[in-house]
Amino acid sequence: MEESVNQMQPLNEKQIANSQDGYVWQVTDMNRLHRFLCFGSEGGTYYIKEQKLGLENAEALIRLIEDGRGCEVIQEIKSFSQEGRTTKQEPMLFALAICSQCSDISTKQAAFKAVSEVCRIPTHLFTFIQFKKDLKESMKCGMWGRALRKAIADWYNEKGGMALALAVTKYKQRNGWSHKDLLRLSHLKPSSEGLAIVTKYITKGWKEVHELYKEKALSVETEKLLKYLEAVEKVKRTRDELEVIHLIEEHRLVREHLLTNHLKSKEVWKALLQEMPLTALLRNLGKMTANSVLEPGNSEVSLVCEKLCNEKLLKKARIHPFHILIALETYKTGHGLRGKLKWRPDEEILKALDAAFYKTFKTVEPTGKRFLLAVDVSASMNQRVLGSILNASTVAAAMCMVVTRTEKDSYVVAFSDEMVPCPVTTDMTLQQVLMAMSQIPAGGTDCSLPMIWAQKTNTPADVFIVFTDNETFAGGVHPAIALREYRKKMDIPAKLIVCGMTSNGFTIADPDDRGMLDMCGFDTGALDVIRNFTLDMI
């Protein structure tokens, strides 16, 4: 545990003296950039609903480039990308597009060099190109210069033939851009035979590739690549169910390779299920039950249950308890969010999802910080959370369980007529936690109370998290003041996160205090935001 720091000394280089001679956790432009890369906004609020990206969202990023720190910005973009610290890819790709079109030469060069690292799949590359097109007018610059052509050519040339074939046949186009467009505009010269085959396939089609290579002596690699491309073409033209299944099994074709018609076949889905990644499996449980791929007692149900209960698979796919909970609640309802698809939930799968929920707690990495969670227990917490199928009390209970089970030092309290302890222990089930919360008489949600209570009771906490619906009433003391008082009294650089889970917008966080964050709604991205914020990465 870090030693506590006197409030009168800077907590780290990120703190600057304020006029009262105390220390406020100042937000620097680099912090603002980190927030933008993580969730698309430089401010202190995480919104679930999609925010439109424009230059006005990235003022700190532009200031950093103007201050000669553009190469540092590129380094941060690469770090966020490699370490998977972003809730969505768009802000990071937008930032890279800005850097690649700015007037600073070294920033520009570093941005183009980073394209292959940051744009890991074709979808990212297409999105990056579209952002460049969107920015062309406002940044008053050209687009298709030599540097971009080289960056695109390198993106294709750095991949092996087989890897590129997999990528271009799975992710064909996005935002109006296709591989054919990019190859035409970049004047690519393939660096290997494998790449020459794939690029010819993209620009001229399978027929020409087949004609060119049918008489040639082929290496094992080339033969494998041609067979794969042939399978991708064959599957597009066949209506024979058995042939589709054979091609899926032999060449590991995925859903994106198939026609809509193929997906009406139960047997085709059974073939896809064999190699289906866990995230796709969780997404498709309802669909596969609705179309009778999963029927009580069949071998497919056994396979699904086996995958869901495999701790190694859960860890490898980085499945969080929250992901499982969403899948479980969605599956349990027996219909899709828009209500068209309907199914009868399978009992064995429900049991497996329930077991997986508890297994995935082991895959969550502790942060090593001290947490104080304050939960709103009012009846309005039964409302549906923005961005989720879950209600607010279920999200709050699940998050209390995650923290209690993974962090050594945590405390849960509830808003009653005063702050009261809410007993959440590591051996409790979700139902037991919800029951414990429902038995506490509800009081008003005054977001300053957790800090006031912790100060009174001398409870040390690095991070306060308030879980409420949209009641973020501030009492006589503003939460920002209560937090600063707590920091001063306890000598702890504490942070505050307020999750207004059914709220479209509220403002509690002081935008100039780096240790405060508001969250409107709650989704799987919110988990990354909380983790990054706790660990000082944003």
From Swiss-Prot:
The modification N-acetylmethionine is found at M1. Its main location: cytoplasm. Residues 120-284 are annotated as: RNA-binding. InterPro entries: TROVE2, TROVE_dom, TROVE_dom_sf, vWA_Ro60, vWFA_dom_sf. Gene3D superfamilies: von Willebrand factor, type A domain. One of its GO terms (biological process) is transcription by RNA polymerase III. A divalent metal cation binds at S378, S380, T445. The modification Phosphoserine is found at S4, S19. Residues 361-538 are annotated as: VWFA-like domain. GO terms for molecular function: metal ion binding; RNA binding; U2 snRNA binding. It is found in: Cytoplasm. One of its GO terms (cellular component) is nuclear body. The horseshoe-shaped TROVE domain is built with 7 helical HEAT-like repeats, and is closed by the VWFA-like domain giving rise to a ring-shaped monomer. Single-stranded RNA is bound in the positively charged central cavity. Antibodies against normal cellular SSA2 protein are found in sera from patients with systemic lupus erythematosus (SLE). RNA-binding protein that binds to misfolded non-coding RNAs, pre-5S rRNA, and several small cytoplasmic RNA molecules known as Y RNAs. Binds to endogenous Alu retroelements which are induced by type I interferon and stimulate porinflammatory cytokine secretion. Regulates the expression of Alu retroelements as well as inflammatory genes. May play roles in cilia formation and/or maintenance. Belongs to the Ro 60 kDa family. Identified in a IGF2BP1-dependent mRNP granule complex containing untranslated mRNAs. Found in a complex with PUF60 and Y5 RNA. Interacts with RAB11FIP5. This is RNA-binding protein RO60. It comes from Homo sapiens (Human). The gene is RO60.
